[in-house]
Design a protein with these regions (language model features):
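N-terminal lobe of the biotin/lipoate ligase/transferase fold
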Residues: 1-90, 106-108, 115-116, 254-255
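Basic side chains
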Residues: 41-46, 95, 197, 206
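Long, positively charged amphipathic alpha-helical accessory segments at protein N-termini or as interdomain linkers
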Residues: 65-67, 74-92, 102-255
Length: 255
């Protein structure tokens, strides 16, 4: 599979919105990135706060049919984790399904969306947006009301804002998505499961999760199955969780 393009934008409202608008211009795997995103989505309805020049905002477009498209966020979390370890030597943990934590604080957020394109919107693709906190100061997270967020620089990494965004964008596109995509497109999440489980901070901890019919369940997270679902042992048996909010005891202030 060849990479069509990694496109840099000096400024962008939202890299996800840009890729949706230009989806047909990309090959099987292509990407866009910026360090100045002015109209992103704040978590849980919060107002978006831009960190101009101090964070990487990246979206990859995938036109390849996928065996398990719903598990792309899990693959994406591994892709980012690997690139951050290569660049900075940090060992991030994954909060299921796709938040990356460093020293217990969130350093990466991921949002995947389906896309329709082409004649009468009959084409189907998927995009994956990734935000990496590179060098925001503590005051940024205070202003954005993100008490559980942090940046690589705040955690002691040596960040070079003149070169790192391009290095990470190229590395994510080539090594994070393009190279494993043949296996992932054919076989889904299963070949990546062991690596994911080893990095998943949920496993062995008490979690609270949303139930499909409403309400919440609680128990100990014991595994991530081959379909990417979080396996939770509850008082009434095992639950396989795939959607909804999951809180982890001791993470983000959850008790």
């Amino acid at each position: 599979m060849s990479i069509n393009e990694v496109r840099y934008l000096t400024e962008c409202g939202s890299t996800n919105a840009y890729v949706k608008e230009h989806f047909e211009e990309f090959g099987p795997v292509g990407a866009v990135y910026t360090t100045n995103q002015t109209a992103g989505r704040g978590r849980l309805g919060r107002t978006w706060v831009n960190a101009e020049g101090r964070a990487l905002y990246y979206t990859v477009a995938i036109r390849e049919p996928l065996a398990q498209p719903a598990t792309l966020p899990l693959l994406a979390s591994l892709a980012v984790r690997d690139q951050l370890k290569l660049r900075y030597g940090v060992d991030c943990q994954i909060k299921w399904p796709n938040d990356l934590l460093l020293n217990g604080k969130k350093i990466v957020g991921i949002l995947c969306e389906s896309v329709s394109y082409g004649y009468e919107q009959q084409g189907r693709g998927i995009l994956c947006g990734i935000g990496i906190n590179l060098a925001q100061p503590e005051s940024y997270f205070d202003a954005a009301d993100l008490p559980h967020g942090t940046s690589l620089e705040l955690q002691g990494a040596k960040v070079d804002l003149s070169t790192d965004p391009e290095w990470l964008a190229e590395g994510l596109t080539d090594f994070g998505f393009d190279r494993p995509m043949y296996v992932f497109a054919r076989d889904g999440f299963a070949p990546f499961r062991d690596e994911y489980r080893a990095a998943c901070i949920n496993i062995g901890r008490r979690v609270t999760f949303d139930l499909p019919g409403g309400g919440q369940g609680a128990g100990e997270a014991i595994d991530v199955d081959a379909d990417g679902r979080l396996v939770v042992r509850t008082d009434s048996g095992e639950e396989h969780v795939f959607t909804g909010e999951v809180s982890v005891h001791g993470i983000y202030g959850a008790v």
